[in-house]
Structure formats: C-alpha cells, structure tokens
Regions:
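Extended, hydrophilic extramembrane loops/domains of integral membrane proteins
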Residues: 112-156
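Surface loops and adjacent helix of pleckstrin homology
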Residues: 68, 92, 120
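Protein maturation boundaries and topogenic segments
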Residues: 1-76, 80, 144-162
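Extracytoplasmic/periplasmic/luminal assembly and interaction segments
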Residues: 71-110
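A residue-level detector for short acidic-glycine micro-motifs
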Residues: 50, 104-106, 137
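Extracytoplasmic
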Residues: 43, 58, 82-84, 97-100, ...
Length: 162
C-alpha cells in the first residue's frame, strides 16, 4: 500500500488552463522586455568601420554613444561639445557615418558653429567642416577614455559588407 501512495504523490497534476495562460503571458512579456532592452541598447552602440582612430579604438570595436536625438528626445546638445570630444557625424565626403575627434571649434560667417574633426591616426584634419546638424552622437567617455567593447562589431561589418 505504501508504494502505491508514493507513486501517486510523485505524479504531477495537470495545470489548470488559467495557470498555463498566465505562464504563457509572463513568457511573452519577458521576450518583449528583452527585445525592447536590446533595441534601446543598440541605439547606444556604434561599430567602428575604419582604423582612423587607432590606437583609441580599432575597426570592429563597438563604442558606447550618446545620441543627439533618440526617439524625439534631445539627449545631447551639440552646442555642449568641446575640443577633444569624439563625435559621430554624417560626412559629406564619406558614405558611412564618421567617428572622429573634435580638434577645433569655429564660428562661421553665418554665425553658426562648425567643428574641425580629425581621426587620431590621420595626418590631416577631415576635408570639410562639420555643422551641428551633421552630428549624430558623441562617444561616451569616462576620464577621457571612451567606452569601447573590443572586436564584437566584426559580425556587423561582415553582414554589411564593409
């Protein structure tokens, strides 16, 4: 008799439909949260596509960025940028966004602010001035050291054919 009771005690009763439904909703909610966090994090990461900023960071590294406009929210004010900041901007001379350091700030004859940028590994400044409207983001730094995740961007470069 004792053996029969143990077998019955070990059997798990089927979950009622309400518990299964709640469990499924929690699982779906978990996946939605993971996807949203991934999207938000992806908005704050950028893959380095060239060696122009070596040895600060290398091709295939991922840098943490502060965007100028994230979902309509002004996260970074370009007028707060200073010499030494590393920015990502839409260049008129290159098809991909460029990640370079601000080496000088100028006021144009039109009264607008323009930035002179240069890759740390390049011998000369970039060929044209950068307007505040071209700036997409600033690389986040802690104690003058940019936040870099080494080499994990190679997969993205391979997929994009860069």
């Amino acid at each position: 008799m004792a053996k029969k009771r143990n077998k019955k005690a070990k059997q798990k009763p089927n979950s009622p439909p309400e518990e299964k439904s709640t469990s499924m909703k929690k699982e779906i909610a978990s996946y939605v949260v993971i996807i949203l966090v991934g999207i938000i994090l992806a908005q704050h990461l950028n893959v380095v596509v060239s060696g122009s900023m070596e040895p600060v960071f290398y091709r295939g590294d991922v840098v943490v960025i502060e965007k100028t406009n994230l979902f309509g929210i002004q996260a970074l004010n370009p007028s707060d940028l200073k010499v030494g900041d590393i920015v990502i901007y839409n260049a008129t001379w290159f098809p991909e966004p460029v990640i370079h350091r601000i080496i000088s700030i100028q006021t144009g004859s039109d009264g607008q602010t323009y930035y002179v940028t240069k890759g740390d590994n390049n011998p000369k400044p970039d060929p044209s001035l950068v307007s505040t409207g071209q700036i997409q983001a600033k690389v986040v730094s802690i104690g003058n050291q940019p936040l870099v995740i080494p080499k994990i961007g190679y997969i993205t470069l391979w997929i994009r054919g860069l």
